[in-house]
């Protein structure tokens, strides 16, 4: 997934956006460090999609209510044999990030880190040195 043997030249951190409360969402402001590396609309679309997925994970509905009831009735042992709605959506997030890295970010010398690996505090984007510059071409 990581660009092969390219040294890290920096990291960018996309902070959480608390303007709408404490729900998990990240700022869509385009960081200057990514200028000339990735299209602004593509970056914003990635962050918006992640925000929508996290909103879906936190949404309370019939399934979440049923999971809670089953958990209470089984002394939470039900979670040994089934995934919660939240866990299923987190898997979707991981898959989406992996796809974005493969299709969009890695070819540009960038790597998105799953926010769950940073405690849902930030989206970390690692910037690798431009291969063309490092190989002397």
Curated annotation (Swiss-Prot):
The keyword Membrane applies. Expressed in all tissues except colon and thymus. One of its GO terms (cellular component) is extracellular exosome. Changing residue 72 to A: Strongly reduces palmitoylation. Abolishes palmitoylation and Golgi localization. Pfam families: Erf4 (PF10256). The keyword Lipoprotein applies. Interacts with GOLGA3. Interacts with ZDHHC9. This is Golgin subfamily A member 7. The lineage of its organism: Eukaryota, Metazoa, Chordata, Craniata, Vertebrata.
């Amino acid at each position: 997934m990581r660009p092969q043997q390219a040294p890290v030249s920096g990291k960018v951190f996309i902070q959480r956006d608390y303007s709408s409360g404490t729900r998990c969402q990240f700022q869509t402001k385009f960081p200057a460090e990514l200028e000339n590396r990735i299209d602004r609309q593509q970056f914003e679309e990635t962050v918006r999609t992640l925000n929508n997925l996290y909103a879906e994970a936190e949404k309370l509905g019939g399934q979440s209510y049923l999971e809670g009831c089953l958990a209470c009735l089984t002394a939470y042992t039900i979670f040994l044999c089934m995934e919660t709605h939240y866990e299923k959506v987190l898997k979707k997030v991981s898959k989406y990030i992996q796809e974005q890295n493969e299709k969009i970010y890695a070819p540009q010398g960038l790597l998105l880190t799953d926010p769950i690996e940073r405690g849902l505090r930030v989206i970390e984007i690692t910037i690798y040195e431009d291969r063309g510059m490092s190989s002397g071409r």
